[in-house]
Amino acid sequence: MNAAASSYPMASLYVGDLHSDVTEAMLYEKFSPAGPVLSIRVCRDMITRRSLGYAYVNFQQPADAERALDTMNFDVIKGKPIRIMWSQRDPSLRKSGVGNVFIKNLDKSIDNKALYDTFSAFGNILSCKVVCDENGSKGYAFVHFETQEAADKAIEKMNGMLLNDRKVFVGRFKSRKEREAELGAKAKEFTNVYIKNFGEEVDDESLKELFSQFGKTLSVKVMRDPNGKSKGFGFVSYEKHEDANKAVEEMNGKEISGKIIFVGRAQKKVERQAELKRKFEQLKQERISRYQGVNLYIKNLDDTIDDEKLRKEFSPFGSITSAKVMLEDGRSKGFGFVCFSSPEEATKAVTEMNGRIVGSKPLYVALAQRKEERKAHLTNQYMQRVAGMRALPANAILNQFQPAAGGYFVPAVPQAQGRPPYYTPNQLAQMRPNPRWQQGGRPQGFQGMPSAIRQSGPRPTLRHLAPTGSECPDRLAMDFGGAGAAQQGLTDSCQSGGVPTAVQNLAPRAAVAAAAPRAVAPYKYASSVRSPHPAIQPLQAPQPAVHVQGQEPLTASMLAAAPPQEQKQMLGERLFPLIQTMHSNLAGKITGMLLEIDNSELLHMLESPESLRSKVDEAVAVLQAHHAKKEAAQKVGAVAAATS
C-alpha cells in the first residue's frame, strides 16, 4: 500500500502567513471553488490551541491543486495575503539549499507578491518569502526554485540590478554553518583593527602616528558624536594582515595618556552579538551547574518571615550561602529561596522542613527549578493526560455508567477531578424518568435531570417572564446561573383555580416522611457531584440537619443519597409548611417557584429563615406585579370593547 501511495501525484498545498483567526471552514470556502477538497488542517499549538499561522490543503486532483496555486497565491484572507506553495514533506529536500537564492538590500515596499512576480520569469518557484518583523520588511528575502539551473540564471541576471531604485544582492543561499566558517576564515586574515578607551585628546593624526609604526595604513578614523566630540574609539585599516596582527599583539593593554587601551580585530555587529551570546550562555550554564541541587524553593511563608528569620530556620541543616524572601512593594510574596553549600545539606533540609509549620503555616520546600524546567514539566504532565484520554477504547466512555436503582446511571469509574461528567445524548435520554411532579413544581426544561449536569451559579433572583392573559402568571421563572425555566405547573394550577397538585400533596406526604429512612452517604452533598465511589471519599464530620416540625431531619448527605428525581420532592415537603406560615394562600405557587433554585441554595434557605423570607418576599413581589399588569390589561381591553 505504501508503494502505491507514493506513486500518487502531489495534490497537497502548504498555505502560510495565515491570520491567527483563520479556521478550516474559511479555508474550505476559499479553496473549494478550485476543485474537490479532501481535507484541510490548520496547524495549532498543542497546549494553547492557537493557530501557528499555516495550514495544509489536500485536493483530490493535482490539477485542482495547481489551479489553486496559480490563481489564489497572495490572495487576502482577514486582511493578510496568504502564501501558497507545494507541500514538501521531506525536510531534507527543503533544507538541502538546492535551488535556494538569497536576496538582500531590498526596498521596504517589496512584498512577497512583488518578489514572486520578479523572479518567476527565471523558472518555477517552490516558495518565496520576504522576511518581516513587526515593523515590516527586514530588507532581505529567499526564493526557492524548483531547479538549480533556474536559481543560477536568476543570480546571473539579477545580482547588482536595481529594484525600486536600490541595488540588490542576489546570491546562492548559504547555511549558518557555511557563513560562520567563511567569517572564521576571514577573521584569521583580518586587516582592520579596532581601538577603544583612549582620551578625547587623541585625533585622527595622533592615532595614525601611533599605529603606523607597525606597517602601511590605508585609513585611520576616530569616531565622533554630532558635536564633533570624540567617542573614545576608532579604527585603523592596514594593507597587510601581518601588520594588523602585530599592532594588536603589541598595543593591546598599553597605557596612553593615563588610560589602558583595548586593541583587537574589528568585528561585524553579527559577530559581536554571536560572541556575546556565547559568553552569556556559558555564564548561564556555569550558574546552573553551581546551584544544581543546592538551591531550595520555599513557599507558603508566613507574612512575618523575613530574610533573617528564613536563614535562622534553615541554618541547622548546613552552611547557607544565601536566603531571600521575595518582596513586592515591601511586602512578602509568600515564597523565597535558600541556597546551601552542598547538595547533601539541601536534601536534608527538604526532608526535615517540608510540611513543618513555621509561624502559622506549613511550609512547602523543594529543590528550585528554572522556568524552562517547570514549563517543560507542566507540558509533559499535560501531554501525558491527553495521551491517557486518547488511549481509552472507544466504548470506555459509553460503558462508564452502570444502571443504578430507579433506572439512573452512575459512573462506574471516578470522574477526573474538577471536570464535569460527560453524557452522550442516548444516556441523557435514559436519564430522564417519568416526572414525579405531574403538574407544576418542576421546570419543563429540567424534568428528571440529575443535579450533576445542572448549571450552577450565583444566588438566584426571581424574575418575571412575559405572562399571558390567563388568571395567573403563565411563566414565572428563576434565574439560576444565567438560565431560566418555565413554570408550566403554575399555569395549570392557576387556570384551575387552585394550587399545584404536587404542592397540595406535600402536607400529607410530610406526615409519613419519617417512616421512609434513607441511606446516608459519607460525603457532603454538592450540586456538581452525584454518586461518587464511596471508597475514595473521605469521611466528613456530622452535618447539621434541617429540622421541620413533624418531619425527619434533612441533611446534605441524605439529599445527595436520594435519587435526583426525589431530591426536589424532599425539599418541597419541608419548604411548603414553612412558606404556608408566611403566605397561606400563595404557599403552593411560591413553593413551586422556589424549587427551581439549586439544591444547595434551598438547603441554605431551610437553615436560614432570613434567607427563606427574602426569597419568599421576592416571589410575592413578582406575583403581585404580574397581577397588577394583568388587571391593567383587562381594563384597557374593557375600555376598547366599550368604545367599539
Swiss-Prot record:
Tissue localization of expression: Expressed at low levels in resting normal T cells; following T-cell activation, however, mRNA levels are rapidly up-regulated.
Gene that encodes it: PABPC4
All residue ranges annotated as the PABC domain in the record: 551-628
UniProt entry tagged with the keyword Phosphoprotein: yes
Subunit structure: Identified in a IGF2BP1-dependent mRNP granule complex containing untranslated mRNAs. Interacts with NFX1. Interacts with ZFC3H1 in a RNase-sensitive manner.
Protein name (database record): Polyadenylate-binding protein 4
Residues modified to Phosphoserine: S206, S315, S319, S531, S584
Domain of life the protein comes from: Eukaryota
PANTHER family associated with the record: RNA BINDING PROTEIN
Modification N6,N6-dimethyllysine occurs at: K361
Family: Belongs to the polyadenylate-binding protein type-1 family.
Location of Phosphotyrosine modifications: Y140, Y364
Residues recorded with modification Phosphothreonine: T304
Modified residues (Dimethylated arginine): R518
Modification after translation: Arg-518 is dimethylated, probably to asymmetric dimethylarginine.
Localisation: Cytoplasm
Gene Ontology molecular-function annotations: mRNA 3'-UTR binding; poly(A) binding; poly(U) RNA binding; RNA binding
Region (Disordered): 436-459
Keywords per UniProt: Cytoplasm, Isopeptide bond, Methylation, Phosphoprotein, Repeat, RNA-binding, Ubl conjugation
Any one Gene Ontology cellular component term annotated for this protein: nucleus
Function: Binds the poly(A) tail of mRNA. Binds to SMIM26 mRNA and plays a role in its post-transcriptional regulation. May be involved in cytoplasmic regulatory processes of mRNA metabolism. Can probably bind to cytoplasmic RNA sequences other than poly(A) in vivo.
